[in-house]
Structure formats: C-alpha cells, structure tokens
Amino acid sequence: MTNMRTMIPAGSSVLVWVTCLLLAFVTTVTGPKVIQPEVDTPLGRVRGRQVGVKDTDRMVNVFLGIPFAQAPVGPLRFSAPLPPQPWEGVRDASINPPMCLQDVEKMINSRFGLNEKIKIFPISEDCLTLNIYSPTEITAGDKRPVMVWIHGGSLLVGSSTSQDGSALAAYGDVVVVTVQYRLGIFGFLSTGDKHMPGNRGFLDVVAALRWVQGNIAPFGGDPNCVTIFGNSAGGMIVSSLFLSPISAGLFHRAISQSGIVTTIMMEDMKPWPEAQNFANSVACGSASPAELVQCLLQKEGKDLIKQKNVNISYIVNDSFFPQRPEKLLADQQFPTVPYLLGVTNHEFGWLLLKSLNILDKLEHLSREDLLEISRPFLAIMEVPPEIMPTVIDEYLDNGSDQSATRYAFQELLGDISFIIPTLNFSKYLRDAGCPVFLYEFQHTPSSFAKFKPAWVKADHASENSFVFGGPFLTDESSLLAFPEATEEEKQLSLTMMAQWSQFARTGNPNGKGLPPWPQLNQLEQYLEIGLESRTGVKLKKGRLQFWTETLPRKIQEWHREQRSRKVPEEL
C-alpha cells in the first residue's frame, strides 16, 4: 500500500491570523510560550490555541465552544434555535465547552472509543456551540473544504469535543467543524404544535450549518464546499438533513457511517401522547399544551434528564420533515449531491449490546431466547408474531451451537438496524442520479483485545478512530486516540483520512495512491475497508433479498390467509 503520509498536498487557503505571541517556542523563565491565534468573525473576535499532530510538522489552530445560536435557556428551552448575538472584546475559545444536558452515566456506558475511555465535561443547557480545527499553513487565494461532524449517541448523549478533529484537519488539509445539538427531551420532546415544536435537535444542526455559511471563511474554510458527516445517530442526522427541504444549499456532500434515518431504531413518534406521558412523570400533566410546556419550563433541567423510558425521535408534518422520510426517498425529494455511506461487519458486536444491557444474555442464548429477544425489534417492523419464527429460521440452522446462536442474533440486529436500511437508502440515491460510494469496514482494531471478547469483529463505530486519525492525536486521553495502533493500522488511518478528505474536496474518494473505490452502480460494487482493502460485490445480497422480497411476500400471504379465514366466519 502506498505511504499516505506524504500524499496530501500542503495548505491551500487564505487566513489572516492575529497572534497574541509572535514566537511559538521562545523559552523564558516560565517555559515555552504558546501561540494563541485570533480570528475576526462577523459576530466578534475569538482566541483559540494551537496544537500539534504526531508524525507531521503541520500545526492546527483549534477554536472551542463558539456559539452558533442563542443559548436555549429560560423561555427558549423548547424553542427552535435563534441566531447568535455578537459579543464585545475577544472570546476565549481555548477551553472545552460544556456538553448539552444529558444522562452522564448513560454516556459513560455508551463508549464509542477503542480504549474504554471518555472525557466527561460539565453539562449545561447553554450548549449550542461548535469547535473548529483548521491547519495553520496558508496559500493566498485558496479555501479549504469544510467537514462538519455530527456526533452520535442515540440522540440522548454525546458531545462535540469527544471527537478531536486536529489529525484529520492536518493530514486531510481540511477545516473540521464539530457541532453540538440539544439531546433527549430538550431536543426532541414535542407537543406537535407551536408550543413545543419537534425536531429541535435537527434544527440546531441546521443553525450550525447556517453559521458555517456566514462565518467559516475567516477560519480558512470554503462555504461552497461543505461536507456533513456523522456516525450512528450522527449518520442518521446526516441522512435527515439530506432529505429535509430546510437544509437545502447548506452542504454539498454527505457521509453517513452506520446510521440512516429509516432505521427501525429511529421511528417517527406520536408527539402529543409522548409529551403527556413525560409530563405526567414529572408532575406536569395537563390537557393543554400551553400549560404543559409552562410547567416544564419551571423545572430544573438536571431534574428532567433523570426521567427514564421516554421515546425520543423525530416527528413528521413539520418544516423539517413535511412527509415521512420513506416518502421523501420514494419521491426523490432530495438533492443529487455525492453521498458516501457504509457499515461495519459486526454492528451489534459489543458496544450496542452493552448499552442495551443485553450483552450478558448472549452467553447462554437458545433459539427460544433469540426469538423472544428479537420480538420487540420485529414488532416495530410490523412482522406478525406468527411469521417471526421464519425470520429466526433465516438466520439460524437447526442444531446450531451457542456461538452460532449468538452470532445469528448479532447479525439479525445489525441487519435490521443498520445494514438493510443503508443498502436500501444507497439504491434510492443511486437510482436518482446521486454519485454514491458504499463501504463495509472490516478491520478489528487491535485494542479491542484489551476489553472486548475475542469474537468481536469490526464493532459499531470502530472506524471513527481511523477516520479521525486516532493514532496521530497528541492528546492520548481523547476518546478516539489510538496510541497503541500497529504500523498497519496507522497506514489504514492515513488512507481513510485521505479518502474522506478527498471525498470532501471533490465528491469522489478516489485519488493517487488510494485503493480503487468504485461508484455504486447496477453491479452493486462497494469497498471492503481493511488493512488490505478490496472491491466487493452485492453486499449482503442474500439477506437483502430476504428482507425486501421473501419476508414481505410471506407477510402478504399470511394476511391473505387471515382475510380468507374471516370471510366464512362472517357468513
């Protein structure tokens, strides 16, 4: 494989930096001085800090916690985001911002890293901020592509600072922006009307993208070359933005990593019943939406996040989703921008099972257990109880041992939650004329051996550390840092950073020295990403046929049989 460390060209954009200190490493009695870059934006001046990246001399300017909307506090708690207000003087953007209100214990239990580590920052309702990572080298007249990262976490947990964009910015020569959005009830609980509009978390991201359009140029970014990308719930948000009419023109490419809005894990909810259910749990029950919201506004935010068992998802029939996502897809109501998307080969390998508290049940899983645990997932897909054993038969042979039963369960959940939705989504886009690039990440990170069972392959979100250059992050306490990566894994990370940034730059992940990545066409080719990447054909062909043809036919036959039985009874 070609060494990617010298492949990516040096800086390519304009940026006028005002520094507080002119010399980066002038030693004094107090030690080396630190460069603190300052940038003038339309809203005010910000002061950041400068960081290095391993195995390269390139430096990155980092600006943390820049507000892209007014703080959603007080009467604005459940309102759509409002434009940010300008500030006087120089805003300190060198320290990590607070995370949006969330259940921190749940976040700790939902680790998306390779090393079972996570930084916990203070939580606050004043959290609509973004971080910017921009290479310091500049060439007059150029602007760098902008890559806007949307974090995952089931719309319940996560933060912008969990993903350090410095290595991707340095090696990819791009401006990386990581954004925060309101989580849980603060971002998605809705009365279904003006009193508490839904999809606020999505609207927060739209506000961030609008901020990027008007403010990213002073940081060296090109507002006409913006890529949105995200993993898990972040990938789902990317696909939602792609389908939403109100985000039109705010981005030019899209990347969804293991997350599509049409997944069964993110069904649209009935807003008013959910709002009433939650309000009753905090003594705010009311038949009046206005009174219900007023009561919730009086509650302490940290008390509201303690409540469990509330359904958090998107709603339809509003400005963000005027119709169901499936309808928007079928009617091709989306822009034909380049789209890169994919999955891992073991989506339910460990992480998601752990967060769902069903990991321990895998040790002695019988066929009956498999059916019972799968029932809620299949019910969401409207599979009749009488047909559910057919699904188990598809995944499990008679006489299978416990390891085969465990793998069948993991494969089943991975297919219905991520892989089949991703494959269906990619074909809709391909047929509409979008340039589509599909992948399956297949490498098992070497660090998994320290805390995951040997049977775990490429688990959910395991590609993140490679996309963000985990082996090259200087802050080894960072969630995605991967200091123990092998030389082969370092090379894989360099390759993936080059592919992702090349896609952001051109709309195509192919480039000199990179593994050939075919565009999705009628041959259904995709890239199998690993230490030795290669082209694959018709990912999960048999399973896709089962879910899109065989099972729907069996369900139709069952319904016809039920109707035919009712006719004699009525006579």
Curated annotation (Swiss-Prot):
GO terms for cellular component: endoplasmic reticulum lumen. This is Carboxylesterase 3B. It is found in: Endoplasmic reticulum lumen. Its EC number is 3.1.1.1. Residues 1-31 form the signal peptide. Involved in the detoxification of xenobiotics and in the activation of ester and amide prodrugs. The keyword Disulfide bond applies. Glycans are attached at N311. It comes from Mus musculus. SUPFAM superfamilies: alpha/beta-Hydrolases. InterPro entries: AB_hydrolase_fold, CarbesteraseB, Carboxylesterase_B_AS, Carboxylesterase_B_CS, Type-B_Carboxylest/Lipase. Disulfide bonds join C100-C127, C284-C295. It is an enzyme of class 3 (hydrolase). Its main location: endoplasmic reticulum. Belongs to the type-B carboxylesterase/lipase family.
